[in-house]
Amino acid sequence: MIHWDQSRTLLSFPRVGLHLSWYGILFSLGIFLSSFSGIKLATALCKDREEKKELRTSLENFALGALLAIIIGARLAYVLFYGGSFYFENPSEIIKIWKGGLSSHGAVISVVIWAAVFSRLHIRKLPMLSVTYICDLCGAVFGCAALLIRVGNFMNQEILGTPTSMPWGVIFPNGGGQIPRHPVQLYEGLGYLVLSCILYRLCYRGVIRLGSGYSAAGALIGVAVIRFCAEFFKTHQGAWLGEENILTIGQWLSIPMIFLGVGIIWIASKKK
Protein backbone atom coordinates (compact mmCIF):
# COMPACT_ATOMS: atom_id res chain seq x y z
CA MET A 1 0.00 0.00 0.00
CA ILE A 2 1.06 3.59 -0.66
CA HIS A 3 0.61 6.31 1.96
CA TRP A 4 0.10 9.64 0.16
CA ASP A 5 0.07 12.87 2.15
CA GLN A 6 1.79 15.36 -0.15
CA SER A 7 1.24 19.07 0.41
CA ARG A 8 -0.99 20.78 -2.15
CA THR A 9 1.56 23.58 -2.45
CA LEU A 10 4.57 23.04 -4.71
CA LEU A 11 6.31 26.37 -4.09
CA SER A 12 5.60 29.02 -1.48
CA PHE A 13 6.89 32.59 -1.22
CA PRO A 14 5.34 33.86 2.03
CA ARG A 15 7.09 37.23 1.91
CA VAL A 16 5.14 38.18 -1.20
CA GLY A 17 2.09 36.08 -0.40
CA LEU A 18 2.58 33.82 -3.43
CA HIS A 19 1.76 30.12 -3.25
CA LEU A 20 1.99 27.87 -6.31
CA SER A 21 -0.12 24.74 -6.05
CA TRP A 22 0.59 21.41 -7.68
CA TYR A 23 -2.80 21.54 -9.38
CA GLY A 24 -2.25 24.99 -10.86
CA ILE A 25 1.21 24.14 -12.17
CA LEU A 26 0.11 20.80 -13.62
CA PHE A 27 -3.02 22.34 -15.16
CA SER A 28 -0.97 25.05 -16.88
CA LEU A 29 1.73 22.62 -17.99
CA GLY A 30 -0.87 20.24 -19.40
CA ILE A 31 -2.57 22.94 -21.45
CA PHE A 32 0.82 24.13 -22.72
CA LEU A 33 1.95 20.63 -23.77
CA SER A 34 -1.34 19.86 -25.50
CA SER A 35 -1.24 23.22 -27.30
CA PHE A 36 2.37 22.66 -28.34
CA SER A 37 1.53 19.17 -29.63
CA GLY A 38 -1.46 20.48 -31.57
CA ILE A 39 0.54 23.23 -33.26
CA LYS A 40 3.31 20.76 -34.08
CA LEU A 41 0.85 18.28 -35.61
CA ALA A 42 -1.02 20.90 -37.64
CA THR A 43 2.12 22.54 -39.04
CA ALA A 44 3.70 19.16 -39.82
CA LEU A 45 0.71 18.27 -41.99
CA CYS A 46 0.62 21.70 -43.68
CA LYS A 47 2.79 21.76 -46.83
CA ASP A 48 2.58 25.43 -47.80
CA ARG A 49 5.32 27.44 -46.06
CA GLU A 50 3.43 30.75 -45.84
CA GLU A 51 0.22 29.06 -44.81
CA LYS A 52 2.16 27.15 -42.15
CA LYS A 53 3.31 30.43 -40.53
CA GLU A 54 -0.22 31.83 -40.47
CA LEU A 55 -1.55 28.55 -39.12
CA ARG A 56 0.96 28.54 -36.28
CA THR A 57 0.06 32.09 -35.26
CA SER A 58 -3.68 31.39 -35.45
CA LEU A 59 -3.42 28.22 -33.36
CA GLU A 60 -1.33 30.00 -30.74
CA ASN A 61 -4.14 32.54 -30.42
CA PHE A 62 -6.70 29.74 -30.28
CA ALA A 63 -4.78 28.07 -27.45
CA LEU A 64 -4.78 31.24 -25.35
CA GLY A 65 -8.53 31.63 -25.78
CA ALA A 66 -9.08 27.93 -25.12
CA LEU A 67 -7.33 28.21 -21.75
CA LEU A 68 -9.80 30.88 -20.64
CA ALA A 69 -12.75 28.98 -22.13
CA ILE A 70 -11.76 25.78 -20.32
CA ILE A 71 -11.52 27.52 -16.95
CA ILE A 72 -14.89 29.28 -17.36
CA GLY A 73 -16.74 26.33 -18.87
CA ALA A 74 -15.33 23.73 -16.49
CA ARG A 75 -16.13 25.91 -13.49
CA LEU A 76 -19.70 26.72 -14.52
CA ALA A 77 -20.43 23.07 -15.29
CA TYR A 78 -19.10 22.05 -11.89
CA VAL A 79 -21.29 24.65 -10.20
CA LEU A 80 -24.39 23.47 -12.10
CA PHE A 81 -23.90 19.70 -11.96
CA TYR A 82 -21.89 19.07 -8.81
CA GLY A 83 -22.36 22.06 -6.52
CA GLY A 84 -25.96 21.46 -5.53
CA SER A 85 -27.53 24.44 -3.77
CA PHE A 86 -24.25 25.60 -2.21
CA TYR A 87 -23.27 28.01 -4.98
CA PHE A 88 -26.79 29.37 -5.33
CA GLU A 89 -26.72 30.23 -1.64
CA ASN A 90 -23.11 31.48 -1.81
CA PRO A 91 -22.67 33.00 -5.31
CA SER A 92 -19.41 34.72 -4.34
CA GLU A 93 -17.82 31.25 -4.08
CA ILE A 94 -18.30 30.63 -7.81
CA ILE A 95 -15.24 32.65 -8.79
CA LYS A 96 -12.98 30.99 -6.20
CA ILE A 97 -11.61 28.33 -8.53
CA TRP A 98 -8.46 28.00 -6.45
CA LYS A 99 -10.56 26.10 -3.92
CA GLY A 100 -11.13 23.38 -6.52
CA GLY A 101 -14.10 22.32 -8.59
CA LEU A 102 -13.78 21.95 -12.37
CA SER A 103 -15.82 19.66 -14.63
CA SER A 104 -14.24 17.96 -17.64
CA HIS A 105 -17.61 17.83 -19.40
CA GLY A 106 -17.85 21.60 -19.11
CA ALA A 107 -14.33 21.92 -20.48
CA VAL A 108 -15.30 19.91 -23.58
CA ILE A 109 -18.39 22.02 -24.23
CA SER A 110 -16.52 25.29 -23.78
CA VAL A 111 -13.73 24.25 -26.17
CA VAL A 112 -16.27 23.32 -28.86
CA ILE A 113 -18.02 26.69 -28.45
CA TRP A 114 -14.70 28.54 -28.61
CA ALA A 115 -13.72 26.51 -31.70
CA ALA A 116 -16.94 27.61 -33.42
CA VAL A 117 -16.35 31.27 -32.54
CA PHE A 118 -12.67 31.14 -33.51
CA SER A 119 -13.43 29.42 -36.81
CA ARG A 120 -15.99 32.05 -37.74
CA LEU A 121 -13.42 34.79 -37.10
CA HIS A 122 -10.52 33.19 -38.99
CA ILE A 123 -11.88 30.86 -41.66
CA ARG A 124 -11.81 33.52 -44.39
CA LYS A 125 -8.10 34.03 -43.87
CA LEU A 126 -7.35 30.33 -43.43
CA PRO A 127 -10.09 28.18 -45.03
CA MET A 128 -8.74 25.05 -43.36
CA LEU A 129 -9.74 26.37 -39.91
CA SER A 130 -13.21 24.88 -39.89
CA VAL A 131 -14.89 23.92 -36.62
CA THR A 132 -14.37 20.28 -37.53
CA TYR A 133 -10.66 20.81 -38.21
CA ILE A 134 -10.09 22.53 -34.87
CA CYS A 135 -12.09 19.93 -32.94
CA ASP A 136 -10.23 17.11 -34.69
CA LEU A 137 -6.95 18.71 -33.70
CA CYS A 138 -8.07 19.09 -30.08
CA GLY A 139 -9.22 15.48 -30.03
CA ALA A 140 -5.77 14.31 -31.09
CA VAL A 141 -3.78 16.26 -28.50
CA PHE A 142 -5.92 16.60 -25.37
CA GLY A 143 -4.16 13.72 -23.60
CA CYS A 144 -1.31 15.62 -21.94
CA ALA A 145 -3.69 18.15 -20.41
CA ALA A 146 -6.15 15.47 -19.28
CA LEU A 147 -3.43 13.34 -17.68
CA LEU A 148 -1.70 16.18 -15.82
CA ILE A 149 -5.00 17.58 -14.56
CA ARG A 150 -5.84 14.18 -13.10
CA VAL A 151 -2.35 13.99 -11.58
CA GLY A 152 -3.18 17.36 -10.01
CA ASN A 153 -6.33 15.81 -8.55
CA PHE A 154 -4.16 12.99 -7.18
CA MET A 155 -1.78 15.49 -5.57
CA ASN A 156 -4.75 17.32 -4.03
CA GLN A 157 -6.22 14.08 -2.68
CA GLU A 158 -9.52 14.71 -4.46
CA ILE A 159 -11.79 12.62 -6.71
CA LEU A 160 -11.01 9.66 -4.45
CA GLY A 161 -11.38 6.05 -5.48
CA THR A 162 -13.30 3.28 -3.76
CA PRO A 163 -11.58 1.07 -1.18
CA THR A 164 -9.31 -1.67 -2.53
CA SER A 165 -7.08 -4.47 -1.25
CA MET A 166 -4.83 -4.33 -4.32
CA PRO A 167 -1.10 -3.73 -3.63
CA TRP A 168 -1.19 -0.38 -5.45
CA GLY A 169 -3.97 0.96 -3.23
CA VAL A 170 -3.30 4.48 -1.96
CA ILE A 171 -4.09 5.88 1.49
CA PHE A 172 -5.25 9.51 1.29
CA PRO A 173 -5.30 10.82 4.89
CA ASN A 174 -6.86 14.13 3.84
CA GLY A 175 -10.38 13.01 3.01
CA GLY A 176 -9.92 9.29 2.56
CA GLY A 177 -8.97 8.29 6.07
CA GLN A 178 -6.65 5.34 6.54
CA ILE A 179 -8.40 3.18 3.94
CA PRO A 180 -6.42 2.10 0.83
CA ARG A 181 -8.21 3.31 -2.28
CA HIS A 182 -7.99 2.90 -6.03
CA PRO A 183 -5.84 5.70 -7.53
CA VAL A 184 -8.70 6.29 -9.94
CA GLN A 185 -7.36 9.72 -10.87
CA LEU A 186 -4.34 8.01 -12.45
CA TYR A 187 -6.42 5.26 -14.09
CA GLU A 188 -8.54 7.89 -15.80
CA GLY A 189 -5.66 10.18 -16.75
CA LEU A 190 -3.60 7.37 -18.28
CA GLY A 191 -6.65 6.20 -20.23
CA TYR A 192 -7.05 9.66 -21.73
CA LEU A 193 -3.35 9.84 -22.61
CA VAL A 194 -3.38 6.47 -24.41
CA LEU A 195 -6.51 7.44 -26.35
CA SER A 196 -5.01 10.78 -27.37
CA CYS A 197 -1.71 9.19 -28.43
CA ILE A 198 -3.57 6.74 -30.68
CA LEU A 199 -5.57 9.54 -32.32
CA TYR A 200 -2.45 11.69 -32.69
CA ARG A 201 -0.61 8.86 -34.41
CA LEU A 202 -3.52 8.14 -36.76
CA CYS A 203 -3.75 11.81 -37.73
CA TYR A 204 0.01 12.17 -38.18
CA ARG A 205 0.17 9.11 -40.45
CA GLY A 206 -2.77 10.34 -42.50
CA VAL A 207 -5.11 7.51 -41.51
CA ILE A 208 -7.44 10.16 -40.09
CA ARG A 209 -7.61 13.46 -41.95
CA LEU A 210 -7.92 16.59 -39.84
CA GLY A 211 -11.26 18.12 -40.71
CA SER A 212 -12.99 14.81 -41.36
CA GLY A 213 -14.56 14.70 -37.89
CA TYR A 214 -13.27 11.24 -37.06
CA SER A 215 -10.65 12.39 -34.55
CA ALA A 216 -13.15 14.53 -32.64
CA ALA A 217 -15.70 11.71 -32.70
CA GLY A 218 -13.14 9.18 -31.50
CA ALA A 219 -12.13 11.49 -28.67
CA LEU A 220 -15.74 12.09 -27.61
CA ILE A 221 -16.59 8.40 -27.57
CA GLY A 222 -13.30 7.35 -25.99
CA VAL A 223 -13.40 9.99 -23.26
CA ALA A 224 -17.01 9.15 -22.47
CA VAL A 225 -16.31 5.42 -22.21
CA ILE A 226 -13.21 5.95 -20.06
CA ARG A 227 -15.06 8.35 -17.78
CA PHE A 228 -18.09 6.06 -17.57
CA CYS A 229 -15.93 3.11 -16.51
CA ALA A 230 -13.78 5.18 -14.12
CA GLU A 231 -16.89 6.31 -12.25
CA PHE A 232 -17.38 2.77 -10.94
CA PHE A 233 -14.11 3.15 -9.03
CA LYS A 234 -14.90 6.59 -7.56
CA THR A 235 -16.55 7.61 -4.34
CA HIS A 236 -19.84 9.47 -4.71
CA GLN A 237 -19.62 12.96 -6.20
CA GLY A 238 -22.23 15.62 -6.76
CA ALA A 239 -25.13 16.92 -4.71
CA TRP A 240 -27.97 16.39 -7.20
CA LEU A 241 -27.89 12.58 -7.33
CA GLY A 242 -27.76 10.44 -4.21
CA GLU A 243 -25.67 7.32 -3.72
CA GLU A 244 -28.77 5.18 -4.29
CA ASN A 245 -28.83 6.12 -8.00
CA ILE A 246 -27.64 3.46 -10.44
CA LEU A 247 -25.52 5.93 -12.42
CA THR A 248 -23.49 8.92 -11.24
CA ILE A 249 -23.82 12.43 -12.64
CA GLY A 250 -20.52 11.88 -14.47
CA GLN A 251 -21.94 8.79 -16.19
CA TRP A 252 -25.17 10.53 -17.15
CA LEU A 253 -23.19 13.38 -18.68
CA SER A 254 -20.99 10.92 -20.59
CA ILE A 255 -23.85 9.15 -22.36
CA PRO A 256 -24.75 12.10 -24.67
CA MET A 257 -21.08 12.36 -25.64
CA ILE A 258 -21.18 8.80 -26.96
CA PHE A 259 -24.28 9.48 -29.05
CA LEU A 260 -22.78 12.73 -30.33
CA GLY A 261 -19.57 10.95 -31.33
CA VAL A 262 -21.50 8.22 -33.14
CA GLY A 263 -23.59 10.88 -34.88
CA ILE A 264 -20.47 12.69 -36.09
CA ILE A 265 -19.07 9.44 -37.50
CA TRP A 266 -22.37 8.73 -39.27
CA ILE A 267 -22.44 12.22 -40.81
CA ALA A 268 -18.76 12.01 -41.80
CA SER A 269 -19.28 8.64 -43.47
CA LYS A 270 -22.14 10.07 -45.54
CA LYS A 271 -19.83 12.78 -46.91
CA LYS A 272 -17.41 10.25 -48.40
UniProtKB/Swiss-Prot annotation:
- Predominant place of localization: membrane
**A Gene Ontology cellular-component term:** plasma membrane
Q: Which GO terms describe its molecular function?
A: phosphatidylglycerol-prolipoprotein diacylglyceryl transferase activity
Its keywords, alphabetically, are: Cell inner membrane, Cell membrane, Membrane, Transferase, Transmembrane, Transmembrane helix
Annotated a 1,2-diacyl-sn-glycero-3-phospho-(1'-sn-glycerol) binding sites: 150
Q: How does it sit in the membrane?
A: Multi-pass membrane protein
| Entry's family note | Belongs to the Lgt family.
What's the protein called, per UniProt? Phosphatidylglycerol--prolipoprotein diacylglyceryl transferase
Q: Which source organism?
A: Chlamydia trachomatis serovar D (strain ATCC VR-885 / DSM 19411 / UW-3/Cx)
